[in-house]
Amino acid sequence: DSTSDQHEWFLEAKKAAKSEYSNRYIFTKSVWDAPPQYRMMCGLCERDGNYMVNYFSSQPALNYGFHEITHPEWQLPCDHPDCLATAEAMKDVMRFWLDKGADGFRVDMADSLVKNDDDKIATAKIWRGVRDMLDTEYPNAAMVAEWCNPERAINNAGFHMDFYLDHYGNGYSRLFRYGEFGDQAVFNPNGKGDIKAFADEYLPNYEKTKDNGYISFMTNNHD
């Protein structure tokens, strides 16, 4: 979803001179163009434009394209050659580490590749391409998504596993940390928790995905 702002790709992309990396990241057309619905970093590049980050300022977003184009002057479609090149470059990164002996990948912010992709259809298509590559070239490798939507991550995008994140109030968090002081959690010894809140969320997701992959429970920080 992103690289470091010190990555050699980004150091080339932020230059004013055009190169094969100019569209590797998402830049606006002008430094004065910073739509508020996106996280943008302003005034840090030689080129005229602001760059999008996925979260922190040091995480420039890789450009896999936009599913819905709202600013055609700088947004590229998913099938643009430069966006396709980004996906292929990331496959090469994966091949590098798999050839070194890695067993697979935990994928940060797995649902965030393609922008303006509310239903994650275009994002899932990219991950399906990655899964096809793994099945063909590295059949023993596995991927786990930081997604917390197993139907999309496993059934649609092809992940082997999807993290069940403990978002406050969801079924998983109700097991361990719920209520102002954690006193409404299922495993709190006071016995006030309700296992049904967990079961009602988990079991339907399990039934939908059990033949295709695994819902992965974290035992510590998801990172």
Language model regions located:
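Structured loops at beta-to-helix junctions and adjacent beta-edge loops in soluble globular domains
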Residues: F56, G65-H67, E146, D166, ...
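Sequence-level motif detector for i,i+2 pairs with an aromatic at +2
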Residues: N50, S57-Q59, H160, N212-Y214, ...
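The substrate-binding groove and active-site-proximal loops of carbohydrate-active enzymes
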Residues: S58-A87, A110-A122, F181-K196, D223
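Active-site-proximal helices and loops of the catalytic beta/alpha 8
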Residues: S2-D33, D92-V93, D103-I215
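Active-site-adjacent "subsite" loops/lids of carbohydrate-active enzymes
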Residues: T3-K100
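Catalytic grooves of carbohydrate-active enzymes
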Residues: R95-L98, T219-D223
